[in-house]
Amino acid sequence: NLLTYNSGGAKVFKKNYIESINNIENVGCEKTFYILTNETRKNNNEYVKFLKIPHIFENIFFLPFTYFVVIPFLIRKYKINKIVNFCDIPIFTKIYQIFYFDWPYAVYPESVVWKKMGAYDKIYRSSKLFLFKNLINNCNLIIAQSQVISDRLKKLYDFQNVKVIKMG
């Protein structure tokens, strides 16, 4: 799931990840990799399929519908059995989900940054935080970039299966 991975370093990671996985040429491979994105992409081979989600589903008002209805529907439709999720919100599913966590707002809810946000940003991030809190238990494993983030996830959300993989 790369649906909302659209700014800063995440955008570069998304581009590199898509280019790498789209070059898979494993003859006899029995697996298909489905990439959920908001960009139109050409399927270069039979092993990688891009599922384009319209930008409207990233809208603050549609986020709950996206994560509770649209994405679970696609999981069932394409018989997806494992998920690697790079977005800020876990997916509502019982399928094995590895969640790559890199959204500091969720582990610093007391930060002064929240008080300095404009109304739209605060509503948008508060909505995402609400979804994160309510969907975190759908994850089987969370990958964090530092021990501090791992410890905060464990403390704030009582989610214990967090592994640290340092990036950069």
Per-region residue spans from a language model:
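A short, glycine/small-residue-rich beta-strand->loop->alpha-helix junction that serves as a flexible
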Residues: 2-16
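Active-site donor-binding segments of glycosyltransferases and PAPS-dependent sulfotransferases
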Residues: 14-20, 24-86
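Alpha-helix capping/helix-boundary segments
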Residues: 40-41, 90, 148-150
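Acceptor-binding helix/loop patch of EC 2.4 sugar-transfer enzymes
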Residues: 98-126
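Membrane-proximal helix-turn-helix segments that form the acceptor-binding/catalytic region
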Residues: 121-142
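Helix-loop-beta element that forms the nucleotide-linked donor phosphate-binding surface
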Residues: 150-168
